[in-house]
Design a protein with these regions (language model features):
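Residues within the helices of the helix-turn-helix
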Residues: 26-27, 37, 48, 66
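Residue-level detection of the helix-turn-helix DNA-binding "recognition helix"
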Residues: 30, 44, 55-57, 84
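Short alpha-helical DNA-recognition segment
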Residues: 32-52
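The alpha-helix within a helix-turn-helix
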Residues: 29, 40, 69
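Residue-level signal for the short linker/turn that defines the boundary of a DNA-recognition helix
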Residues: 20-23, 33-34, 60-63
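N-terminal flexible/basic segments that precede or flank functional cores
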Residues: 1-23, 27, 75-81, 87-107
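Short, solvent-exposed alpha-helical "recognition" segments
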Residues: 57-62, 88-90
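DNA major-groove recognition helix of helix-turn-helix/homeodomain DNA-binding modules
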Residues: 4, 44, 63-78
Length: 107
């Protein structure tokens, strides 16, 4: 039996503050030991934009967040949620959102 405490997203946010797309991308890039150039190429973002996103100077639209998530093969809902929550915080609103994919309707 392990006595190690397991942390969920809520626990991490309490300890480290609100998560962001930029913080997520920076952590991912550093864990993969990729340069800004190589990582930017992988996710379809220029070096300048990636730098601005990582430093919190630029946000990411939900659409772009979904594209990035697909390139990284992570659940798109994760980055889309972070993107929407960042937009809300930038507007001075304190909300948490739950994002779930819905089936596309036939045309």
């Amino acid at each position: 039996m392990s006595t190690e405490k397991k942390y969920g997203l809520k626990d991490l946010e309490r300890r480290l503050g609100k998560q962001s797309v930029g913080a997520f991308l920076r952590s991912w890039r550093l864990s993969e030991e990729l340069s800004l150039k190589d990582f930017g190429k992988k996710i379809g973002v220029s070096v300048a934009n990636l730098c601005d996103i990582e430093k919190g100077r630029k946000g990411v639209s939900p659409e772009k967040a979904e594209q990035i998530a697909k390139a990284l093969r992570v659940p798109p809902a994760l980055l889309v949620r972070l993107s929407i929550e960042e937009s809300l915080r930038a507007a001075g609103l304190s909300y948490s959102v739950d994002v779930k994919p819905v089936a596309k309707r036939a045309a």
